[in-house]
């Protein structure tokens, strides 16, 4: 058996199949571009799915690859097992060879056996195989061509040895190759009662696609039989390096050593080191492929993996952010095979560090809540509502809580957690419901030809009319409705661009268009009629050209902004949404932190530089594949027709877009950013104005500056210096006022000492401190605690319509009286609630008329509480 590094195995596999006339195909992205049903690329065949289905052709019929895969979230989820078993990973590499109607079973079996026994020299006696129980072809090839004894060819009748792409479509039997680790490890061969043991490990699966399953379950032979194989790189590396666990191979040894270093871990066998070492691989590659941490979809899976790693690092003893420091170690191990890691190192590290720091703020508090709850828990199941509270309040994914439970030999109530989640989702859906849209109620089978790219006015014929949700033949004076034309210059709302407005002129009337939307293949012109308009009328449709020009400026500026963000912030930036109006543009994009003022200034400068370059815009219709080959940016997850419209701005920007644009970039005039904000986890929003609107905005800001200068008696050049000086003076005066209030409160407090009473051997002071600022209450309580030495204090004050309450307990008495309980007793009587530490707690209320009664009730409450 030949000892090889992981990198050597990967290369030798690809070289071997290249020598067998296979095209070496690079790993595709972890984000499947051709399968919306998959969260992540989880097998080598995913990038070839359309080839297998006959929907795509390639210039080769044989291929080989080493495919990056992630299994975490969705149907294929290994997350909870990672670190606790020898072979579960969130990220792994799948070595594979594929035949698209070329060779079939005989050569697939021959190639696999040749690679294992001749190339990497595995002992033949250590190998055995499984076949589907009635696959006589495979049996004969293994027996006659390879020479395997019949007792090492195991027939399996279950679905484990029959693969299918779905309920219908391509399918076929499998043949799996197993390696025997030896009698010293417990376990039996596949198909035996002991098959779940670790002695016999599957290393390679050969799938023979030979049938097409019909809706009725019958299976017809495929016209072109194909082969799909997959071998886990980490598994074969463990065998060739003479170790039993994947975590002992060269690649993981380096990552585990780095993880131990950054977490100060002492025990190199700690399972948490495995978790951290595994998770840095999936997290780094996901970020490299454009996934950002968020609260939904792929981004949430990434967030869960990061948070699980951070929790395990915390468990190992890590102080502060540590996870991002492992990126360098990962690049050292895998950067040669995947140079994109090194290229994006800075971005990957930054995303991980920010996410870790944000979670670190709640991790300690959440763990404390969990520990406290577990100490009071009866039984070995963590309630679903607690799991939900940790998720909702502290950002603990349920699988992180399950991880903690597993370490305590406990489980979580998944059903209860899902019920809580269902309630939350229902509430969110109800909150998000708005009035029904016209278009939700209407259907049209008409087709409108769009003429608006080249003209602002066009003759047309009315082909359909709606009044409300009813199809009618006529709209009469003052009536609102929808008019559908056979041709129109009006752009229908889509791709983030608002619909056009304008007029549709007809003999005997005029239809004022207030919006244009799509209704299937028809364009729906919404508006109100003066006079009349009806079916088959000949009309002239004219858009509001001035408004359209403003929209065009904003749409083209959006394209320039998008490219600028990618150049300045990083290629991880992707469009998450946009709104192109006449008044302004709004652009939502993926980014992991707020854009700084300096970055915004640079973004604005670059966009305006590109505008001044005055590049000509060109549009072209082309095949979607040709557009992507030219580098046209497409929105991920969007469905495009086979033919798409490509908008190019000089040599700066190229995007798929159906919207309207200026003829040259210089037509935009000026671009000015109005605001930048966060709208969701990992999503930022920039709003901006262009052209005359930008000039008006700058003029307005200049006027505001002049107004401020006039107020502070300065000119515009020195206004900042003058305002800064005034703020400094204001802070000094506020500090002096606070000091005076503290002195007044202390003096008032001293006079309260005469009100101290002793109940059950404990001093108690209750007072309504009229006229005292609520901000001064805490200082007053501290001062009183020092003066009385040992005791309990309850103070209240009413101002306007509010009540402020505070309770203080000296440290020696917190075992008998809790400040939080006392302040909440009072707060419940004045329409409020509060909280704090055992020795100091505050509350507010909205019923000042009940303050006296609340304070009067303290004596009885305290007497009962302190009885021995």
Swiss-Prot record:
| GO molecular function terms attached to this record | alanine-tRNA ligase activity; aminoacyl-tRNA deacylase activity; ATP binding; tRNA binding; zinc ion binding
PROSITE patterns given for it? AA_TRNA_LIGASE_II_ALA
Origin, by domain of life? Bacteria
The disulfides recorded in the entry are none
Q: Does the keyword Aminoacyl-tRNA synthetase apply?
A: yes
Question: Region annotation Disordered: residue ranges?
Answer: 828-847
User: What cofactors does this protein use?
Assistant: Zn(2+)
**Which InterPro entries does UniProt cross-reference here?**
aa-tRNA-synth_II/BPL/LPL (IPR045864), Ala-tRNA-lgiase_IIc (IPR002318), Ala-tRNA-ligase_IIc_anticod-bd (IPR018162), Ala-tRNA-synth_IIc_core (IPR018165), Ala-tRNA-synth_IIc_N (IPR018164), Ala-tRNA_ligase (IPR050058), Ala_tRNA_ligase_euk/bac (IPR023033), DHHA1_dom (IPR003156)
Tell me, what is an example of a GO biological process annotation in this record?
negative regulation of DNA-templated transcription
Q: Which Pfam families match?
A: DHHA1, tRNA-synt_2c, tRNA_SAD
Q: How is the cofactor bound?
A: Binds 1 zinc ion per subunit.
Gene Ontology annotations for the cellular component aspect, listed alphabetically: cytosol
Q: Which reaction does it catalyse?
A: tRNA(Ala) + L-alanine + ATP = L-alanyl-tRNA(Ala) + AMP + diphosphate
Q: Which residues bind Zn(2+)?
A: 555, 559, 657, 661
| Chief localisation class | cytoplasm
Query: Which keywords fit this entry according to its UniProt record?
Result: Aminoacyl-tRNA synthetase, ATP-binding, Cytoplasm, Ligase, Metal-binding, Nucleotide-binding, Protein biosynthesis, RNA-binding, tRNA-binding, Zinc
As recorded in UniProt, its EC number(s) are 6.1.1.7
Compartments (UniProt record): Cytoplasm
Question: What is stated as this protein's family in its record?
Answer: Belongs to the class-II aminoacyl-tRNA synthetase family.
Q: What does the UniProt record say this protein does?
A: Catalyzes the attachment of alanine to tRNA(Ala) in a two-step reaction: alanine is first activated by ATP to form Ala-AMP and then transferred to the acceptor end of tRNA(Ala). Also edits incorrectly charged Ser-tRNA(Ala) and Gly-tRNA(Ala) via its editing domain.
Indicate what this protein is called per its UniProt record: Alanine--tRNA ligase
| Species whose genome carries this gene | Pseudoalteromonas translucida (strain TAC 125)
